[in-house]
Amino acid sequence: MIRKEVEEAPWWITETGVIISKKLKKPRKTFITPHGYEMIGYTHPKKGTQNYLVHRLVAKYFIYDIPKGMFVNHIDGNKLNNHVRNLEIVTPKENTLHAMKIGLMSGQPGESNSMSKLTNMEATNLIYDLIAGMNNVEAGEKYSLHPRYVSLIRHKRRWKTLWDRIERSTTIA
């Protein structure tokens, strides 16, 4: 088993993510974060308590130093599989696309999307206004939106799920 010295604390780390105490020559206990990642703490004499994500330590010592703003991705989606063969350094966008591809994350619809400009109720009212004949400029003024964004809603490029729900509920069978 290959192990490397960790500069942040008196430990060795293996390619599987096991942290070994240099003093006791035994594996150190780790804990699981609320987000499901394995973490280890160390109380530094001068810096105080420091916590480290195990997968980031494995990546740093067995792949290469992680550039600022980059993520360490678990290839199989298992946050506790910290083996170096299961890790890769990726951009935030690549990390999100990977999570969506393997089913760990889906695009958030409606107001739960962090980029949403409207609440579900506002979007519903806007769609009903568009159905009733309101133009993009009027709707933009009423809802404080750019007319181009209103156009995206009108043509179902935004809020499509809500459009579909409204159309299903208003059609006569």
Curated annotation (Swiss-Prot):
Its EC number is 3.1.-.-. The keyword Nuclease applies. SMART domains: HNHc. InterPro entries: His-Me_finger_sf, HNH_nuc. Keywords: Endonuclease, Hydrolase, Intron homing, Nuclease. It is an enzyme of class 3 (hydrolase). GO terms for biological process: intron homing. SUPFAM superfamilies: His-Me finger endonucleases (SSF54060). It holds the Pfam family HNH_3. The keyword Hydrolase applies. GO terms for molecular function: endonuclease activity. Transmembrane segments: none annotated. A possible homing endonuclease, it is entirely encoded within the YosP intron. This is SPbeta prophage-derived putative HNH homing endonuclease YosQ. The lineage of its organism: Bacteria, Bacillati, Bacillota, Bacilli, Bacillales. The gene is yosQ.
